[in-house]
Design a protein with these regions (language model features):
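Short, membrane-interfacial amphipathic segments enriched in basic
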Residues: 14-62, 238-243
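Short cytoplasmic-facing helical segments at TM-TM junctions of multi-pass membrane proteins
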Residues: 139-164, 245-249
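Membrane-interface helix starts
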Residues: 54-80, 258-261
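Membrane-interfacial helix-loop-helix connectors in multipass membrane proteins
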Residues: 92-116, 182-225, 233-255, 275-282
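Active-site cofactor/substrate anionic-group-binding motifs, chiefly glycine-
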Residues: 66-122, 126
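Hydrophobic alpha-helical transmembrane segments that constitute the membrane-spanning cores
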Residues: 81-88, 123-128, 164-193, 226, ...
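Hydrophobic alpha-helical transmembrane segments of multi-pass membrane transport proteins
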Residues: 106-149, 177, 234
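Start (N-cap) of specific transmembrane helices in multi-pass transporter permeases
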Residues: 146, 157-178, 252, 256
Length: 282
């Protein structure tokens, strides 16, 4: 005859000891303090950059060079991304609405999504990798090879010579790249609608025009300008703070790309809250 087994006792959670609780609170405190330190250091860096903009004779000769490197040479990336984004958007719009709405609404959805969100954000994320890493690696190499120290010894201000032209070029050229990406995205969406969805050109253009406002373009371009400024500032600060030789340069480039991507998403949410809250489509 088998005896019934006794129920398994439920384990009671081990209470935190004072030392363990102190360690956890200390870790949270260190993380919070580090976050505020980084925000404060970043704010001081932005203020120093704005002050250095007064020395136009220092940064103006370098501006066109960086505008070409950071902006013009980034156009193929923006166009390539927008090309396939427009095609995918047209197909998704047709799949989502089906026969529920007139066919011209495909043009409306493509136009609104490209200009308001996808062209600025996707292009910004791609350029964060190219521009942010480029700036951080270039300035980081100059730091570890003591070129920046040599400039300071010769009484040249690194902020006006190195930081300001890159920040201004990135801020002004990001909207140019995004504007071209908007146009390419609309054209590719139109081409996909004609070739794959049996939507005529008048129908697609009707959908583009019916809810189009100049706010759509202004919103996307202003947002992209803020992305460009953030990417350049983060890349410059990461590069100037580089330590540890070649490995330090690699860490600075990686840090610049990651922080820039996060900041782009934060700014995207910020501009949506500021400009889109309570705003209707018309």
């Amino acid at each position: 005859m088998t005896t019934p087994s006794s129920p398994t006792p439920t384990p009671t959670p081990t209470p935190l000891t004072p030392n363990a609780l102190h360690r956890r609170v200390s870790a949270v405190g260190r993380l919070t303090r580090s976050l505020f330190d980084q925000v404060g250091a970043g704010s001081r860096f932005v203020v120093a950059t704005l002050r250095a903009m007064r020395d136009t004779q220092d940064w103006l000769p370098e501006f066109s060079i960086h505008a070409r490197v950071l902006g013009v040479e980034s156009l193929p990336i923006g166009m390539f991304i927008a090309l396939f984004t427009g095609i995918v958007l047209a197909l998704l719009a047709s799949y989502s609405v089906g026969d529920l709405v007139p066919p011209y609404f495909v043009g409306t959805l493509v136009q609104k999504t490209i200009t308001l969100e996808l062209a600025p954000v996707l292009t910004g994320l791609a350029l964060a990798g190219r521009v942010g890493a480029n700036i951080a690696a270039e300035l980081g190499t100059m730091r570890v090879t003591e070129q920046i120290d040599a400039l300071e010894t010769l009484t040249f201000d690194p902020m006006s010579h190195l930081v300001v032209p890159r920040v201004l070029a990135s801020t002004l050229m990001f909207p140019v790249v995004v504007g071209v990406a908007m146009l390419v995205g609309l054209l590719s969406g139109w081409g996909a609608s004609l070739a794959l969805l049996d939507i005529t050109t008048p129908q697609f253009l009707k959908g583009v025009r019916i809810f189009f406002t100049d706010f759509d373009v202004r919103y996307g371009l202003v947002k992209s300008a803020s992305f460009g400024a953030a990417v350049a500032l983060i890349g410059c600060r990461a590069g100037l703070n580089t330590q540890g030789g070649a490995q330090g340069v690699g860490r600075s480039a990686t840090r610049a790309v990651v922080i820039s991507a996060v900041m782009i998403l934060v700014l995207d949410a910020f501009w949506a809250l500021v400009w889109l809250t309570g705003r209707t489509i018309r």
